[in-house]
Amino acid sequence: MTQDATKCPFHAAAASGGIINKDWWPNQLRLDLLNQHSSKSDPLGAGFDYAEEFKKLDYEGLKRDLRALMTDSQDWWPADFGHYGPQFVRMTWHAAGTYRTGDGRGGAGRGQQRFAPLNSWPDNVNIDKSRRLLWPIKQKYGQKISWADLLVLTGNVALETMGFRTFGFAGGREDTWEPDQDVYWGSEKTWLGGDARYGKGTPGDGTLVAEPAMHGHEKDRVLENPLAAVQMGLIYVNPEGPEGNPDPVAAAHDIRETFARMAMNDEETVALIAGGHTFGKTHGAGTADHVGPEPEAAGLEQQGLGWASSFGSGKAGDAITSGLEVTWTSTPAQWGNEFFENLFKFEWELTKSPAGAHQWQAKNAPATIPDAHDPSKKRVPTMLTTDLSLRFDPAYEKISRRFLENPQAFAEAFARAWFKLTHRDMGPRARYLGPEVPKEELVWQDPIPAVTHDLVDAADVAALKARVLASGLTVQELVGTAWASASTFRGSDKRGGANGARIRLAPQKDWAVNQPEQLARVLQVLEGIQREFNKGADGDKRISLADLIVLAGAAGVEQAARAAGVAVTVPFHPGRADARQDQTDVESFSVLEPSADGFRNYTKARYSVPAEVLLLDKAQLLTLTAPEMTVLVGGLRAININVGGATHGVFTATPGALTNDFFANLLDMSTEWKPAGDLFEGRDRKTGEKRWTGTRVDLVFGSNSVLRSLAEVYASADAKEKFVRDFVAAWAKVMDLDRFDLR
């Protein structure tokens, strides 16, 4: 028997696709999201320390090479106006601009622009050429500079070579080696579709086109959370206007909403748009049907590049990116104030690019704008619909006129907004590396005072634990408060966490999930212990409330373990400080309020997304693995830190003891589970007597095959000590997630 050589062997079929579980069961829980970016995908190995490598970088040499690159035009992709600066600014902007505050995901922090889907988004057409221009420099400096850092630093150097003074630069972004799978970019299945995120709109066909049916309805739409772009594959907004409708006032609504979701106020928004559009041009020499597949769909011979164009030479003056053909100023490779000068000097008439896209042309204006590649040609000034929003939206106009009259204020605002744009997802200043880190502390960096006192030692820790346990606070209160403090951390943008003790400040002290009345009472007791200890401590030794909250949680966990018959010491690393209210932007921190916390069996409202999916999202933001998530849920149910003291999921007769009862009783086949409204009831199969109530978050550990396999480990008769020790390890990890000083 011989195999037909023309048919695909099964190994090759597996490698090239085939039907997978997700195809059969689309709603299957994506536990694989907790296994992203593991050591198996990292070619540098577990011992690689990027911060140490960065210290070895010839930083000034790198910047010299980047400056030289700016005017070293290559025949395979010639520089517009003889300067690559504008296209590198676009590259950097689009790397950082995917960040959104809702869940902290996106942004430049992990070099994700190299991978799908970002490397093939319609809004990123031809940015692949910018990264390829950088390859010789990246190759030269190797692992001393990550792609993630290089993509941002290059934009800074580009601005500097065009006469702009930047606010600074911080390194510290570590590369990942595969696409992020946890970022929800929207549910549309066509490029530039916006129908799902607004509930109406055009499905999109891969080009930026007007949609007459939408005219007059643009202001009515509300963008789906946590998205911060109006269409699938855009960074922010459609430059032609909402759904392609060239209405600058309607476009201002989209601009304000999307930029706000990236933590930008109106002044920062105006500065960023005008500053970015001081440089370079857009490209729309021909129609989109000349443009080939994006990088992820291009042939092997393209070697990771995409959008090969059949229009003329396909490059330089024949380039096609957005389909728009706009140059804003007469000095497109030089910083200046001409964007605002032109914006207000001229009246504007609607026209179309050679590709048929809506854009605006100055009326009766002289041809003062240079051609990007032909010195003998001049053009009249042009603008995008979204540029005109800065003049015709009343709030934006006020800011724009101030910048027109005060160029220095504009330059300062752009420098600060650009730094915020490119560093917003890096977390606290403790992560910043390099010689150009600004000295000024900015409130959006969530600053925390430096620790200037001596830290507690082992004897102090033991004494403080004893005081905490003798204070009258329950194990549930101690563990619950520590969890509430630490579990705000987001691995996406490195915000939140226990350091700073912001749980005692607005807005966190008032969040319903934190049970404000109970929290205030617990904090009052802990503050009393802190004052008493600090007053009697030797020398300059002190303990911060941030440290004491975590230490009290450790004491609670140890007490719960003792109640289960296991002696354990929870790791504790002092060194946290207490932030002040003036260091805490209430609006900025409000996005950290959990809509759900499955670890506390809490949901703020009824959501269309199942509670177990929200648990998974929370676990992913906490950088937990599936086993860590599993053991934490089981342990926290056994202790019972449920919001409001609810007993859902508390499958034990001894709440407060760190037992494996949650798993043992969930998997007990003598219990039959049935839905009961939004909950589930577990009843004795023989008598019908109600034993337990549980939520979707609880029951998923017996329902999902992967989670059940983990639950079985902890439900086993020999798992008593393993369960406790695994819980303690996962607990300690969460408590220290924001301790970048320990890494």
Swiss-Prot record:
Record key words, sorted: Heme, Hydrogen peroxide, Iron, Metal-binding, Oxidoreductase, Peroxidase
Ligand binding (heme b): 277
Catalytic activity, reaction form: H2O2 + AH2 = A + 2 H2O; 2 H2O2 = O2 + 2 H2O
Post-translational modification: Formation of the three residue Trp-Tyr-Met cross-link is important for the catalase, but not the peroxidase activity of the enzyme.
Covalent cross-link Tryptophyl-tyrosyl-methioninium (Tyr-Met) (with W-93) as placed by the record, residue numbers: 236-262
Cofactor note: Binds 1 heme b (iron(II)-protoporphyrin IX) group per dimer.
Chain segments annotated as coiled-coil in the UniProt record: none
Record site feature (Transition state stabilizer), residues: 90
Transmembrane region(s): none
Residues at the active site: 94
InterPro entries linked: Catalase_peroxidase (IPR000763), Haem_peroxidase (IPR002016), Haem_peroxidase_sf (IPR010255), Peroxidases_AS (IPR019794), Peroxidases_heam-ligand_BS (IPR019793)
Quaternary data: Homodimer or homotetramer.
Task of the protein: Bifunctional enzyme with both catalase and broad-spectrum peroxidase activity.
Cross-link (Tryptophyl-tyrosyl-methioninium (Trp-Tyr) (with M-262)): 93-236
EC numbers on record: 1.11.1.21
UniProt record similarity statement: Belongs to the peroxidase family. Peroxidase/catalase subfamily.
Name recorded for this polypeptide: Catalase-peroxidase
Gene Ontology terms describing biological process: cellular response to hydrogen peroxide; hydrogen peroxide catabolic process
Any one annotated GO CC term: cytosol
